[in-house]
UniProtKB/Swiss-Prot annotation:
Protein family: Belongs to the purine/pyrimidine phosphoribosyltransferase family.
Organism of origin: Buchnera aphidicola subsp. Acyrthosiphon pisum (strain APS)
EC number per UniProt: 2.4.2.8
Quaternary assembly: Homotetramer.
Cofactor entry: Mg(2+)
Superkingdom to which the source organism belongs: Bacteria
Gene symbol of the encoding locus: hpt
Binding site for Mg(2+): E99, D100
PANTHER family, per the entry: HYPOXANTHINE PHOSPHORIBOSYLTRANSFERASE, HYPOXANTHINE-GUANINE PHOSPHORIBOSYLTRANSFERASE
UniProt-recorded name of the protein: Hypoxanthine phosphoribosyltransferase
SUPFAM superfamilies according to UniProt: PRTase-like (SSF53271)
Residues at which diphosphate binds: R43, G44, R166
Chemical reaction(s) catalysed: IMP + diphosphate = hypoxanthine + 5-phospho-alpha-D-ribose 1-diphosphate; GMP + diphosphate = guanine + 5-phospho-alpha-D-ribose 1-diphosphate
Keywords: Cytoplasm, Glycosyltransferase, Magnesium, Metal-binding, Nucleotide-binding, Purine salvage, Transferase
Taxonomic placement: Bacteria, Pseudomonadati, Pseudomonadota, Gammaproteobacteria, Enterobacterales
UniProt GO BP: GMP salvage; guanine salvage; hypoxanthine metabolic process; IMP salvage; purine ribonucleoside salvage
Length: 178
């Protein structure tokens, strides 16, 4: 489908906000005696977590999880499958899930349920982009980079459209041509 891209968050704005998030996370966890682990939900969060982890100034581990809930279509089936599970044990650790974007919240809700069964000390969420108007599941998000109040397709900074545009240094809105 023919489309154009409109920049909605610049590279500079991303850099400033990721620094701020790193400071907020550092402040929250700096006095904890428990180990901290960041869990990136792949693939969309890979650029965000690589920048964010360097802005968190306390010792932490990093791990990755890949899930799927789409089957063959474009709409989520709600049935979350773990494609790549964690390599590290999260028992008694402060877990911070790092997400690129939260829309309906269905997949993230299932991931939370799965991780809670592994008995972390704490379980928090950091998302680069939050679309609260699209939420279908009640999820408490601890750290939000930017709220997107309109419902449109977003690309860049790790987020793709048909596996394209992940490389963009900014966040863009996909504008479909009629």
């Amino acid at each position: 489908m023919k489309h154009t891209l409109q920049v909605i968050i610049t590279e500079k704005e991303l850099d400033i906000r990721v620094r701020e998030l790193g400071q907020e996370i550092t402040k929250k966890y700096r006095n904890s005696r428990n180990k901290m682990i960041l869990i990136a939900l792949l693939r969309g969060s890979f650029i965000f977590i690589s920048d964010l982890c360097r802005r968190i100034h306390i010792e932490h581990e990093i791990d990755f999880m890949t899930t799927s809930s789409y089957g063959r279509g474009m709409l989520s089936s709600g049935d979350v499958k773990i494609i790549k599970d964690l390599d590290e044990d999260i028992y008694n650790k402060n877990v911070l899930i790092v997400e690129d974007i939260i829309d309906s919240g269905k997949t993230l809700s299932k991931v939370l349920d799965i991780l809670k069964l592994r008995n972390p000390k704490s379980l928090s969420i950091c998302t680069l982009l939050d679309k609260p108007e699209c939420r279908e599941v009640n999820i408490n998000v601890d750290f939000i980079g930017f709220s997107i109040l309109e419902n449109f397709f977003i690309v860049g900074y790790g987020i793709d459209y048909a596996q394209s545009y992940r490389y963009l240094p900014n966040i863009g809105k996909v504008v479909f041509k009629k």
